[in-house]
From Swiss-Prot:
This is Probable hydrolase clz13. Its EC number is 3.5.-.-. The lineage of its organism: Eukaryota, Fungi, Dikarya, Ascomycota, Pezizomycotina. Probable hydrolase; part of the gene cluster that mediates the biosynthesis of squalestatin S1 (SQS1, also known as zaragozic acid A), a heavily oxidized fungal polyketide that offers potent cholesterol lowering activity by targeting squalene synthase (SS). SQS1 is composed of a 2,8-dioxobicyclic[3.2.1]octane-3,4,5-tricarboxyclic acid core that is connected to two lipophilic polyketide arms. Pathway: Secondary metabolite biosynthesis. Glycans are attached at N61, N89, N286, N422, N456, N477, N581. It comes from Cochliobolus lunatus.
Length: 613
């Protein structure tokens, strides 16, 4: 029996809706309209066959004859798919001529992922009091300097907004190999050191004085000398700022080298040892290290001095060696567990260049509606990408879909954009289809009050590709509620009559034992919001305000829905509407013939627990 009156008058609804945020255009539809999907065996098989065919054709191009490639796709549970391409020109190789899951690559800036994890774990454990602490609190020997180190925070370094130089002590070009080459060197840091005499002459740069050369770190001049923290800090004390701190995103490998020094100062052990003890060993990344393995196990080009180059203090930004298998293991960990119990480390921290790019710790985040071709459904790709000499590595994490991709290449690289598009876009489309089908199978349908409740109330939920789960009909005590809400919302917004009431999961789940002890119920909380069906891209229609808790009724949130699921089977049994103080049972034919008597007994207790919250 309902404890509170279900008779909402137009006047009451008008008062409630007057407290809501402004109208939301369709382009402001909430993201992730579904729980994190799972991928039963063979569910993505057709998609992977298509991706394999595309990738095979792409790397058959003559320009990739000396290129080795490894691509893996993983969920939080297991590796789902892999693609390996060995260089057809075997004479170009000085290492393994067979590429597989255990082939070692230099993974360049993917090293930053481990550094960021380590810093966030130290913060989580209380060894770093605040991510907004100035870095010179931990590394006072950065001063004296013209850089305002007392304004550069740990957070700035993690997000690449410290405003400091990008690279120091990088000499990626070996003059012995390219004395007459054109400008084809990837990853150079200093033209004076990295370019041949001919290349420098073509740029018509002025001569460099001996006084300037004398203050440069020895490892900047001689690649065979590993750079150390003392040399880096000395160089930074004489460096100039690129921007003021926390103003502009500009990549800084030096920033992550400083984070490596921070880890050493806090832990009392070398950076490499700390990463091995806290990340590599616990995750059993058995082929991951900061030292090159024997060439026979690696993807190594002939005359490639980058393979064995000891980058020293730059290990936290570019020094790691790893395999496709180990990186997939690391990515599974990132999907399953955050290094911080406080922060959502997938969330952006600052703007980046362009309208679709953001940055995080240490992510380059790409957010676009292109994969799904639905204007109001953006996909978010959390990436780390980098090049070191002939090596390019990319990781792409899609937490909404419980998927991650790794790409490792060496040789004639080309740009990774094309292959990333050919892998991730079909993958996202297939994963989105699986996720929405799961919502359709598990949540869509009509939920009704039981005869014993003596009230004519129900809710009908449907699924669409652009809005996910939405309320199609809401009946309270015999009255249709949605038309009233639509009219009042339209009146408040000043125009527009086509309102969509969309539900999204909050991931605030709990479990309890059924009353008779014969089943465990999962209480899965969702919230719904209202979206005005206006096209995106027109004027200010893309300006979005968000609130999933805009109104309450007698202290209960009107927009809260709690689905009750049988923990063993995963079947949705009922939904509790908190504001209406009622639990509605899923129609028997839509509940997969779950034993109705047992379900109702469990649901009665579940509803009482929800109302008691």
């Amino acid at each position: 029996m309902c404890l509170l009156s279900m008779r909402f008058t137009v006047a009451i609804l008008l008062v409630l809706l007057s407290h809501c945020g402004g109208s939301h255009a369709t382009s402001c539809t909430p993201g992730q309209p579904f729980p994190v999907p799972s991928y039963p065996e063979s569910s993505l098989q057709e998609t992977f066959e298509h991706i394999f065919e595309t990738a095979s054709g792409y790397f058959e191009n003559e320009s990739f004859q000396a290129t080795n490639v490894a691509i893996e796709v993983t969920s939080s549970r297991e590796t789902l798919w892999s693609f390996y391409h060995a260089a057809k020109n075997q004479s170009s190789q000085d290492g393994s001529t067979v590429i597989g899951k255990d082939t070692v690559f230099r993974v360049a800036r993917v090293s930053k992922l481990l550094t960021a994890i380590a810093v966030l774990q130290l913060h989580d454990q209380g060894h770093v009091s605040s991510l907004y602490d100035p870095i010179n609190d931990y590394i006072p020997d950065l001063e004296p300097s013209s850089v305002q180190w007392d304004r550069v925070t740990i957070w700035d370094l993690l997000n690449n907004v410290a405003g400091i130089l990008d690279m120091c002590s990088y000499t990626l070009f070996d003059k012995r190999l390219n004395t007459n080459s054109d400008f084809t060197i990837d990853g150079y840091a200093d033209i004076y050191m990295d370019f041949s005499a001919r290349q420098k002459a073509d740029l018509n740069l002025p001569p460099v004085s001996d006084a300037i050369l004398e203050v440069m770190p020895a490892c900047q001049v001689d690649k065979s000398i590993p750079c150390d923290s003392a040399g880096l800090l000395s160089w930074l004390r004489s460096s100039k700022a690129v921007f003021n701190p926390h103003q502009v995103n500009s990549n800084s490998n030096v920033g992550f080298s400083l984070l490596g020094i921070l880890i050493e100062r806090i832990s009392g052990v070398k950076y490499e040892q700390f990463i091995h003890q806290t990340i590599i060993e616990p995750l059993q990344l058995n082929s991951t290290s900061f030292r090159p393995p024997h060439k026979d196990s690696g993807a190594v080009l002939q005359n490639d001095h980058t393979w064995s180059w000891d980058v020293g203090v730059n290990n936290p930004s570019v020094g790691l060696y790893s395999t496709p298998c180990d990186i997939s293991t690391l990515l599974r960990w990132t999907l399953n567990k955050s290094p911080s119990s406080i922060l959502n480390w997938f969330a952006p921290g600052f703007y980046a260049v362009g309208s679709h790019s953001l940055i995080g710790m240490p992510w380059n985040i790409f957010r676009t509606t292109t994969p799904l071709s639905i204007p109001n459904r953006p996909t978010t790709f959390n990436t780390v990408v980098g090049t070191l000499g002939p090596y390019t590595s990319v990781v792409v994490v899609m937490p909404e879909y419980d998927l991650a991709v790794s790409l490792m290449m060496n040789g004639a690289l080309g740009h990774p954009h094309d292959i990333l598009t050919n892998v991730t876009f079909p993958l996202i489309r297939a994963a989105d289809k699986i996720a929405l089908e799961s919502v359709q199978d598990n949540y869509a349908g009509t939920y009704k009050a039981e005869p014993g409740q003596k009230i004519n109330s129900s809710i009908t939920l449907s699924v669409s590709s652009d809005h996910g789960l939405r309320i199609s009909e809401l009946i309270s005590n015999g009255s249709s509620i949605l038309p009233v809400m639509e009219r009042l919302a339209s009146s408040k917004s000043g125009g527009g009559a086509n309102w969509i009431f969309q539900a999204v999961p909050t991931f605030l789940d709990s479990k309890h034992q059924g009353r008779r002890g014969d089943g465990v119920i999962v209480d899965e909380e969702w919230r719904w919001t209202y979206v005005l069906d206006k096209p995106p891209g027109e004027g200010w229609n893309d300006w979005c305000l968000s609130s999933f808790d805009p109104v309450t009724y007698a202290g209960e949130p009107l927009t809260k829905m709690v689905f009750h699921k049988d923990a063993k089977s995963g079947r949705v049994l009922s939904v509790a509407l908190s504001g209406y103080n009622i639990t509605l049972t899923k129609a028997v034919q839509e509940a997969d013939s779950f034993a109705q008597g047992d379900a109702l007994d469990l649901l009665a207790h579940a509803g009482q627990e929800v109302l008691a919250e």
